[in-house]
């Protein structure tokens, strides 16, 4: 049986992608060694599956449709710059999201979908963020740069749909293929066939 890399995520509208691209361009002067996330690949990850069997993927689609069909849209502010594991030894560069409460509720609701499909959720606490870049080594201290941008804000993210993506790794970077789109506020839902 074949398996795929997949993840559940909130997509970003092109305007927000463009605003983030501008931030990435500004940061490149200070963080030249970073690999920046391509704007079209920017998203808010809820759950990632390194390997998921096709049969389980189909169960997950059914569960997501049943649980998320009545979800209401909401907005979060894109605010502040940070890094994992921390700004003193960064590996992942991210933009923060506030308030976190509704995102955490959405994470728990989608976690129910995973359990219904026979999957487990990550045991670490959920930390909503937008990954905008990665560093191969954590030898750069970015704490001063990041502290000067803690109050930085750009346009809000309208959380109005959820997409189940397949992630195909390519030499030029990951390709994200939508498999299922659930529109919030009782709007139409789309099931995609990956090719």
For each predicted feature, which ranges?
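Histidine-dependent nucleotide/RNA phosphoesterase domain, centered on the 2H-phosphoesterase fold
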Residues: 1-195
